Amino acid sequence: MQKDQLMQWEIEGELEAGIPLVPQISLLKKYIAEGNDIVLISDMYLPKEVIVKLLQKADPLLATLPLYVSSEVGHQKTTRKLFLHVYSDLDYCYEKWIHIGDNRFADQVQPEMLGIQTAPIPVPEWTPYEKRLADYSSHYEFRCVARQIQSFRLTHPAPEEQFAYCYAALYLVPYV
């Protein structure tokens, strides 16, 4: 019972705090517009239905793409077996396979060992301010706020907007 409640809270937290990665979504849409087939592959412990909800929240198009999740398939990218499962399940007949991801080992080293071309996505660094905010408290909410600030900063380059959203707004919250 307690385990089920903890899992439910974890799922609710993920669904509430999930922030779309706009540059990556734009890249996927570009590839789709160019006529490429897109398959989503995830090493994730959450059930596939939860991942689909997160994708739907980020962009409805993402929820329509084929999705392979390690928790459902029983294989992981880190062991290369998830890639092999996708290969056999898709009746693969492509000239090349390009895998895009942000984890050096799971998304670059392992697929390259199978001859899959990789395109690493750099993980955005925290600014010192974002890092201090995320580490400020043991409360999960602080990390969520830091992540939202980072996401805003990465998608809104105007310094005035960044200052207002990332710094000034937090000081005004207690007065609202």
Kindly label every feature range from the protein language model.
Residues S71, D102, A119-E141:
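Catalytic or ion-translocation cores adjacent to nucleophile or general acid/base/metal-coordination motifs
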Residues E130, Y136-Y175:
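Flexible inter-domain linker/hinge segments
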Residues K3-Q56, P66-V69:
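Substrate-recognition element of Asp-dependent hydrolases with the DxDx(T/V) motif
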Residues D102-T118:
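Acidic, divalent-metal-coordinating active-site segment for phosphoryl/phosphodiester hydrolysis
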Residues M44-K48, V73-H75, R104-F105, P124-T127:
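Short, solvent-exposed loop/turn segments at secondary-structure junctions
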Residues L55-S71, Y136, A146-R147:
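Structural recognition of alpha->loop->beta junctions
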Residues R80-F105:
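Conserved Lys-Pro-Asp/Glu-containing loop-to-beta segment of HAD-superfamily phosphomonoesterases
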Residues P60, Y68, E72-T78, F83-V86:
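Catalytic cores of eukaryotic secretory-pathway lumenal/extracellular enzymes that build
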